[in-house]
Amino acid sequence: MVNAKHDTFCYDSEGYQREIFDGNALFEAYKRAKKGSDWKPQVQRFEMTYLLELSRIQRELQEMTYEFLPSTQFVLNERGKTRVIRGEQIQDRIVKHTLCDEVLNPAVKNFLIYDNGASLVGKGIAFTRKRLLTHLRRYYAQHHSNDGYILLIDFSKYYDNIRHDILMELMKKYVTDEHSLWLLQKTVDRSKVDVSYMSDDEYENCLDILFNSLLYQEIDQRLLTGKKFMGKHLNIGDQVAQTAGIAYPIPIDNFVKIVKGVKFYGRYMDDSYAIHESKEFLEELLKGIVEIAGSLGITVNLKKTRICKLSDHWRFLQIQYSLTDTGRVIQKINPKRLTAMRRKMKKLAPKLTEKEFTDFFRSWFKNHYKIMSRYQRNNIETLFNQLKEVTLCSTQSDLQTEGS
């Protein structure tokens, strides 16, 4: 395909798209897939014959005969949530990098609202937080007051309840390449859930029932015979799932931004907010969102979804906010995040060198110090100085001193 920008190595410029079996695309995907995991034996073995392996992958993708390798599964506790994560082999990560970076992301990007900040180059959680601050300040500038409300929306088990049939219909609007759609369907099919334990009546209505992958882990494996599969659920940690996660609620975002004309609206994966001067308007907006979400097969968590006054203290993406009557936006870190960080520091200090521990702490501190009080900053810096004495280098030097 023609590269109008003549930038052979710049895949994120999106001046063109390459086929998923393009040799250059696979090589660049290989470099991205192994980044940060070169130390793993599996990756090192692949590197020894990577040209032969990439050639094989290229041929199998072109002939549509590629088969995914078995994945690993583990449970991750993060930010107070327990999630089931699946790890992919290096070959599968390369293939999914090519699919997402060369086809899905460029195809979907133009249909996303600007304030959708997840899993996109140049965006992220920091981008979404900055946009929220911008929206709050613009709201105050327009209304000269903090009298207003914010609707905070959360979905129940978002990735667990993404329906495969709806996702494929959505993607077919943006992607027309035969090979890409074949690979996407193959990827989605891997996420099907064995529900052989269900009765015929339960199986008939399973797509309309909230699915929880954590509870699913407790089911007796002997009941999972492979006779019935549910076309719902995506694996967290899968790059395709991340792209699907930002594209799946496009109908909701278009409803809020275009149909309802809400200017101060943003999204980060399954967390979103809408700011308006009328509480009644936000209540009606929520009803519309719940209806559209239901048609997509996802469920709004009404226990966590709430409407708050802008002048009250409310939390979004683990930070507490409040808009004062002078237009100042107060930000405070979630105390639970500080507690988790202190525990992590105590656990890692004996396992890291002093430089590694310092880099780890400073990178975290730089991102959070502005939303911490002086008391909180002093406390965590005191702990850091104390723990530096028990890092790996410090302990080894003490042992050498005692030995001499």
For every predicted segment, state its role.
Residues 46-70:
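Amphipathic alpha-helical blocks
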